[in-house]
Amino acid sequence: MVLIKQIVRFILVILFRVEVEGIENYYLAGKRVMIIANHTSFLDAVLLSIFLPDRITFAINTEIAKKWWVSPFGKIVRLFPMDPVNPLSIKAFIKDLEQDKRAVIFPEGRITVTGTLMKIYDGPGLIALKSGAMILPIRIDGAQYSIFSRLKGIERRQLFPKIKLTLLAPQKIELDDEIAGRDRRAAAGKILKKIMTDMIYSTSNNHLTIMDKLLQARAIHGAGQVVLEDVERQPLNYRKLLLKSSVLSRLMARQTQEKDVVGLLLPNTNATVLSFFALQSIGRVPAMLNYTAGYKGLLSALETAQIKTVYTSKRFIELAKMDDLIALLNEQVNIIYLEDLKQMITGQDKAYGIACSLLPKIIYAQQWHSVQPDDPAVVLFTSGSEGVPKGVVLSHKNILSNMIQLGTKIDFNKNDVILNALPLFHSFGLSTATLVSVLNGMKVNVGKTSEKRIGKSDSGA
């Protein structure tokens, strides 16, 4: 059996480039251990049985245990058929764990059909509590993109995606003796759910820049995945988004300096999002200006963030009746209209955009070396309702960490369509609605800005 295990391990490493991190935690957990893992695919049990030391026990549904293909698997691991609704079955499993066994159980009870955590049942938490077993959380990542998952039509599945197993520090569920009955079961289940969600968060990679994450999303979901649309009904997929933002970035690079904070005074349109990513790709920091703040509010924001250049739109200024406001701001900063940039595009700019849309990792790698995850990614501003608007600097890591936290609580996938009813200068409008969507393969419609409201708000400039 050892030889078979080694052969299967070799094959899996070659095909799926399997990486195991934190194996020392397996031994730190001791002998009486309940191993819990997220359930991503039919490969999960094979991966755990092959890459974990020893011959471990697998809790398996009694109906699944009757399948013909389960029998060969039982030669590598020890199978423990369980009926999840039968109290006697659970008691038997607890007694088995008390014999200082290491056993694997999937708290979700089934393979995910959303790509994220499914409902986590209380039973495994109660088992860990009553048996006194240490809990060893293991994150399985990558198998959800394989053909062995149940995400057909939800994720872009691959034949041999890279798979990583991460073993976290062992934990133990402990409760006060005063908690009894159903409350005790529920409390144990609640702790287990927290362990699972914390596991997903702590093993997700937030040490990236926004552009790194954009390219990662393109690779996962495909260049043709539509992710952006506005009221003009001209949807953009990853390929077009990278093409247009890359051309725009060349023009902006000639007008600004690296690490400059650059103002965007724009409504909710594709052009605003393209401008945001264009600035990201050349190491500038976008500052999302609140066009309803009036002259004093905007001037304060410009001074606070030390903004020297602001990009806006002639059409937007005209519809919003902000000509007087822009004339005043133009005395303080350099106002550049996106419409004017179109006249500056050269053949080299277009060629660069095409190259970036086809080979983004190769082209962009030369530009991003100076941008780090902890560097500022965007500057937002408070409403000013309690005084002068304050600048809020968010790093790339801040934004991606918030996105990961959201993903542990909400099921979303590339088939979802998000309507962003908030302005892009709003933290939720930019990060929660727009960036979460674009960076996860979902299509976001950035809605429509109310010109009437803008004009009224700025009339006192």
Where are these regions (language model features)?
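Conserved AMP-binding/adenylate-forming
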Residues: 251-293, 421-423
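AMP-dependent adenylate-forming
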Residues: 213-238, 377-380
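Conserved pre-ATP/AMP-binding loop-to-beta segment of ANL
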Residues: 335-381, 388, 411-417
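Conserved AMP-binding/adenylation subdomain of ANL enzymes
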Residues: 400-417, 425-461
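A cross-family acyltransferase "interaction/gating" segment
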Residues: 22, 98, 102, 115-179
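Conserved structural elements of the adenylate-forming
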Residues: 10-13, 241-247, 359, 364, ...
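Structural core segment of the AMP-binding/adenylate-forming
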Residues: 254, 281-354, 461
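Conserved AMP-binding A3 loop
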Residues: 235-239, 368-370, 377-401
